[in-house]
């Protein structure tokens, strides 16, 4: 092909075609014929069956740097809970959302509280299976450096006590009681450090508006841990329970981690002498109601009575909750 022919072909690309009236325009060279018809059209990336995969792909967004993205992602999971409550997606969902208990954003924490409540309404066993990690992050929230995170930690505890309160009391009774006392800025029999007392006085003035919520959570924890659960049984049930007592011992337990108190697979760290004074009762010694009542009487009851009387005199919503705790204490220790 000569040089002149190449130049002519290049010029054709830049020439403007003249349009004539009544004559159609010419089709371009790269046009596609769309005159065919099809009965079905399948697009693999838009199948309805891939809804679960889409939710699984959204899990990394729970760690996004933008708090609005985290909140919107939690809202999507709240709407999808009825569909995914019995799927394998719940395990990674609870394990990743439990970390947001210590999130800096208030909107994210409120949305997370709604998510836990929605999960508990549909299937409380899901929360019971993850109660160990939930207790861990609630305890981290109670000792958080940010006051707003510390104040909201009791809201999560109060919500989860409705669905897995017995498991919480069995596994971390002393930690939860000490955490609520720390949030309320109350001293126990074992906290005699003057620096802690000075810090408690400063935080008590700052957190007065959250005091009513903390006291209601304390009431729920005491009621769940120090009162025997009331179960209505008939005479036929009692006789059948006595006959099948030996069989029940060898059957699958009705609650998760039935032998967790034995700590067969847990690695325990050696505690120093200073830490021993702060925890008079270990978690394995607070598995029944009697030991928890004994723990409250020896460690928390004197301070509780003293502080409650002062709050009742101040009145308000906190005074009402303190009065309820006073009635509960008199009922337990009567």
From Swiss-Prot:
Domain of life: Eukaryota
Gene Ontology terms: biological process: maturation of LSU-rRNA from tricistronic rRNA transcript (SSU-rRNA, 5.8S rRNA, LSU-rRNA); pre-replicative complex assembly involved in nuclear cell cycle DNA replication; regulation of DNA-templated DNA replication initiation; ribosomal large subunit assembly
GO molecular function annotation: chromatin binding
Cell compartment(s), UniProt: Nucleus
Main localisation: nucleus
Function (record text): Component of the RIX1 complex required for processing of ITS2 sequences from 35S pre-rRNA.
Subunit structure: Component of the RIX1 complex, composed of IPI1, RIX1/IPI2 and IPI3 in a 1:2:2 stoichiometry. The complex interacts (via RIX1) with MDN1 (via its hexameric AAA ATPase ring) and the pre-60S ribosome particles.
Name used for this protein in its record: Pre-rRNA-processing protein IPI1
Name of the gene this protein is made from: IPI1
């Amino acid at each position: 092909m000569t040089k002149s022919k190449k130049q002519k072909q290049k010029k054709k690309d830049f020439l403007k075609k003249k349009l004539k009236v009544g004559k159609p325009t010419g089709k371009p060279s790269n046009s596609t014929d769309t005159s065919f018809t099809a009965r079905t059209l399948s697009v693999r990336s838009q199948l309805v069956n891939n809804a679960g995969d889409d939710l699984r792909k959204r899990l990394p967004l729970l760690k996004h740097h933008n708090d609005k993205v985290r909140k919107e992602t939690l809202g999507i999971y709240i709407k999808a809970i009825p569909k995914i409550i019995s799927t394998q997606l719940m395990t990674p969902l609870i394990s990743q959302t439990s970390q947001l208990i210590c999130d800096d954003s208030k909107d994210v924490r409120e949305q997370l509280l709604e998510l836990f409540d929605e999960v508990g309404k549909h299937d409380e066993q899901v929360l019971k299976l993850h109660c160990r990690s939930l207790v861990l992050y609630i305890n981290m929230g109670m000792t958080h450096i940010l006051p707003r995170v510390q104040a909201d930690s009791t809201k999560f505890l109060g919500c989860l006590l409705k669905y897995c309160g017995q498991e919480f009391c069995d596994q971390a009774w002393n930690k939860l009681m000490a955490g609520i006392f720390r949030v309320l800025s109350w001293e126990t029999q074992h906290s005699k450090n003057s620096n802690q007392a000075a810090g408690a006085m400063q935080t008590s003035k700052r957190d007065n508006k959250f005091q009513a919520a903390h006291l209601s959570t304390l009431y729920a924890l005491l009621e769940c841990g120090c009162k025997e659960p009331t179960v209505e049984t008939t005479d036929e049930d009692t006789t059948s329970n006595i006959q099948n007592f030996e069989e029940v011992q060898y059957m699958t337990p009705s609650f998760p981690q039935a032998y967790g108190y034995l700590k067969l697979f847990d690695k325990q760290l050696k505690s120093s002498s200073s830490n021993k004074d702060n925890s008079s009762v270990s978690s394995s010694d607070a598995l029944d109601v009697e030991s928890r009542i004994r723990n409250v009487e020896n460690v928390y009851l004197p301070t509780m009575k003293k502080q409650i009387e002062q709050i009742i005199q101040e009145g308000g919503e906190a005074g009402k909750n303190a009065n309820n705790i006073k009635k509960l204490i008199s009922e337990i220790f009567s």
